Amino acid sequence: MKYSANLTALLQTDTVLVAVFEDGSLSPSAQQFDGQGEVSALLKSGDISGKIGEIATFRRQNQRIIVVGAGKPNDINERQFKQITQKAFQAVKPTSAQTLANALTEVQINGRDLYWNIRFGLETIAAESYIFDEFKSKKADPVKLRNVIFHADDKQAQLAVQHGSAIALGVKLARDIANCPPNVCNPNYLAAQAKKLEKQTALLTTAVLGEKEMAELGMHAYLGVSQGSKNEAQLSVMTYKNHPDPHAKPIVLVGKGLTFDAGGISLKPSADMDEMKYDMCGAASIFGVMNALVELQLPLNVIGVMAGCENLPDGNAYRPGDILTTMNGLTVEVLNTDAEGRLVLCDTLTYVERFEPECVVDVATLTGACVVALGQHNSGLISTNDELAEQLFRASQQTQDKAWRLPLSDEYQEQLKSPFADLANIGGRWGGAITAGAFLSNFTKQYRWAHLDIAGTAWLQGANKGATGRPVSLLTQFLINQCQ
């Protein structure tokens, strides 16, 4: 699907979206199509009242006019605008429409501008049109719509389309990878995707470390997790260089890539274990962000790292009670093999020191405790640097890819003490999301660091089961902000 913005398409597309409000008022474009009272008649007859998400349709010559209820004028928030856009697009999908003029750009959203309206609308439409049927013998009927033209034409509108299109593609690619079954998407598959991206642009190169290279570097915590799997662990490093100063320090993004996590010897319950293919959503999101970077060609140096691995029970699997030596020399007593993500990440976070980063942000489906604490709407944010934390929080608010900061203080380190090693890999029952972050902080002393726990936001359950692509939007916005 292609997206653009101009003011000339309103009378040229086969389908148009216009808004009406609860007080009976019409948006400017709705007024334009009310020349013979068609829109007003829908309101008078009660076919539509203007409440959020209501839909009514009429034809005018060769055009299909979809009238969308937009609630109370000048009192519409982001969540309501998303509902308006979703309902509108759901009305378009089953039709034969191929070109759509979207005049919902005229809906005013509290505290937001036209740029935000267009970009958020575009990302919402892209999400609503997402289909993943690669492994179905009978494919879903494709959406006939080919072009969406937003009714606006200034520099901010064009920028919104550019940013939104790149982010929407990044989200789609992240979802595609995450939704793949684990017998397809293993660590080698992640590495192959990174190598494929390298071939698409001169701005990005990819290097892949296998288990031999990791062993030489002393990444024994990472390798300990991988012991039970026949699929070799792979650390995929994507280096994007486009800063005017080639020596500028890179921003490093690290994604946990457990392509399947059975829990190891500390085996997970069988119920919903299939969802543990989503334990690589952190890595998938980093891949999506790097794709968005390539599309936008932002003037930055960024390194994206996907830490691919599997955690399976086997005669060679690591055990509760094992003590592993990490890359930075600290030893870790394994009390639970299902707290494996932090073991993969701690060595990866040590590895990226070599890049002398401006900052490091890791993304991981790390703890069920974070889901208990924050639910499925906000990712958990932990950081040792207030400025970096604020930058990420601001990006989350800009995009509605929400995150909420959790505390991190020395008291939580007390829970990680072990009588036999420098650290234990779990910190007991309380504050599990925070103690996981506290564990990681021991490996981030050389740079500014933040951690996003996406265990509650990376995928949906139930009827809409599947990966969400979060936090691609948040992280891409964070990078865009670095250029301003």
UniProtKB/Swiss-Prot annotation:
EC number: 3.4.11.1, 3.4.11.10
UniProt KW keywords: Aminopeptidase, Cytoplasm, Hydrolase, Manganese, Metal-binding, Protease
A GO biological process held by the record: proteolysis
Signal sequence residues: none
Co-factor note (free text): Binds 2 manganese ions per subunit.
Cofactor(s) listed: Mn(2+)
Pfam name, any one: Peptidase_M17_N
Annotated Mn(2+) 2 binding sites: K256, D261, D279, E340
Stored SUPFAM superfamilies: Macro domain-like, Zn-dependent exopeptidases
PROSITE patterns for the chain: CYTOSOL_AP
Protein's cellular compartments: Cytoplasm
Catalytic center residues: K268, R342
A GO molecular-function descriptor: metalloaminopeptidase activity
Gene3D superfamilies assigned to the protein according to its UniProt record, in alphabetical order: Leucine Aminopeptidase, subunit E, domain 1, Zn peptidases
Annotated CDD domains: Peptidase_M17 (cd00433)
Residues given in the record as Mn(2+) 1 binding sites: D261, D338, E340
NCBIfam families, A to Z: PRK00913.1-4
Cited function: Presumably involved in the processing and regular turnover of intracellular proteins. Catalyzes the removal of unsubstituted N-terminal amino acids from various peptides.
Record-linked HAMAP family: Cytosol_peptidase_M17
Family stated for the protein in its record: Belongs to the peptidase M17 family.
Name of this chain's protein: Probable cytosol aminopeptidase
